[in-house]
């Protein structure tokens, strides 16, 4: 939820931690000897096995909500209060007693080596569909750094967190651990009304968008210029991934091949919409999407068997990541 508070392109930003976090972020938490935590609630999507979370570290927890402190993860030191005063006070203490650079240089080098050795994995497009990672990276380039991006819930949400770079606070809008399918379109609509002069992009999937697709009519009626990118894999992708990895491939009720064309649904409500099935057609389609005045939608076919990695299986330690393949 804090994505953008620290620019994604800052070299010392290790990326998101947790179940679908980066290899480097998860290993850094596992190996560090001091963990400063600002405003986190330590939900199970971040900690993995709570008993084995940050096993070598003393934990300092800053939070405005006293209830969150020591609720899940024990803090060796806690600071309860508004970050607007607690962080500046902490900084003054650091400036008064600075840590010698020699004590941190080796660790920082190790982290950069981790990042270089374990980059985020982008799979190539295939005859089954476009690479979702490429779609998100190209969408971000076309939308520009000022764009606000909202997501629904599922694989596309995790890919957006991993591959859609954000450099400003409050520019990545998602329901986070609440897991609310259908959240994305009304969230994007509200963001566009609140920031009428900025581009607003909705990243969604063909499962989530069906939860609230009637709001296309609202976009059309009021000319709300949300640009929607639908990653269509004809499955409830995250459910399908878990069924394949942990339930012996029993793909119960996760097949969406009977769903209508999302582009067709949008057009029926007055929103211009197109489809893309080949990577060579993507740049022109994105240009057309962002050139359109008012709302518009692009439906992109991605492979149905594309999984989100890394993945920490439920209850496992953060360093027990699955980094690829078809099963755990």
Language model feature labels by segment:
Residues 100, 107, 112-117, 124-128, ...:
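Conserved acidic/glycine
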